[in-house]
């Protein structure tokens, strides 16, 4: 019998950081295409995005675990969106003190100090929905099997009533 254990917080942080970094690059590439019709799709971000996204999504994971039985999905997504704005403002403000903030929303109509902008409310909300329903929920299902040998196939899935058990 395999002894599978949940991923550590550091392992989950790593997955969240890489996911956020990738999404940031893809979003900036798509934005460049929509705004400037640039077929090169130049996606860019900063290495700071790894820390920012990894930490933020790990905190949202904690929120999800506490709120999932208490709040409807849309309310949770509003809470996550508000958290995203607070986190983006806070990290941006700190990085700006060192001339290291990689974003500037000053050109947007509804920006605050160039660090956050209301124009991103819908993308942040949609991102929060995807983050909870796909990224966090599936990351929490991942397991380390400490008895598995590297390179060997996993043990066959357990059968339930003659069917492969997927949960």
UniProtKB/Swiss-Prot annotation:
One of its GO terms (biological process) is response to bacterium. One of its GO terms (cellular component) is membrane. Disulfide bonds: none annotated. Keywords: Membrane, Transmembrane, Transmembrane helix. The chain crosses the membrane at residues 15-35, 41-61, 74-94, 110-130. Residues 36-40, 95-109 are extracellular. This is Transmembrane protein 229B.
């Amino acid at each position: 019998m395999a002894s599978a254990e949940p991923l550590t917080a550091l392992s989950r942080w790593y997955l969240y950081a890489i996911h956020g970094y990738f999404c940031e690059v893809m979003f900036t590439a798509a934005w460049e295409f929509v705004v400037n019709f640039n077929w090169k799709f130049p996606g860019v971000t900063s290495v700071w995005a790894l820390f920012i996204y990894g930490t933020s999504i790990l905190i949202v994971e904690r929120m999800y675990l506490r709120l999932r039985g208490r709040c409807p999905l849309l309310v949770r997504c509003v809470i996550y969106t508000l958290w995203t704005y607070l986190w983006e403002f806070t990290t941006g403000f700190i990085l700006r003190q060192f001339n290291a903030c990689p974003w500037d929303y000053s050109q947007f109509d509804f920006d605050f100090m160039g660090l956050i902008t209301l124009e991103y409310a819908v993308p942040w909300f949609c991102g929060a929905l995807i983050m909870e329903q796909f990224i966090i929920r599936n990351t929490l299902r991942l397991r380390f099997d400490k008895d598995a040998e590297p390179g060997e196939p996993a043990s066959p899935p357990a059968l339930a009533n003659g069917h492969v058990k997927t949960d």
